[in-house]
Amino acid sequence: FSVQERINIIKSDITSLNELNSKINVTELSGLLTTFAKDQNATCIIRGLRAVSDFEYEFQMTGMNYQLNPDIETIFLMTSEKNSFISSNFVKEVHKLGGDVSNFVSKNTLEQLNKKNS
């Protein structure tokens, strides 16, 4: 999916959250994450980790981000064990080969995948 297609999918998927007066803004990022975070008045960056292999890269990125802006903290959230193997690349590949990915993506995302691959 293009960046704009991904933004539209996410916006559609979080509609119910925004109805609860949450303050979620989905936007394209260009440039440095620390600059974007500062421009948004953010004080932390939340990153997800699936496996130990993700940690090394994220740890290095956190170190660089700290050097660029020490006022912004990074928080890591671990996925549940049952979802630790899921990645967008695996989902796209399984879907292209005709596999059922409905347990891994939203209904809206599945519809968009079906349209894209038909």
Which role fits each region the language model picked out?
Residues 1-118:
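Nucleotidyltransferase catalytic core that binds NTPs
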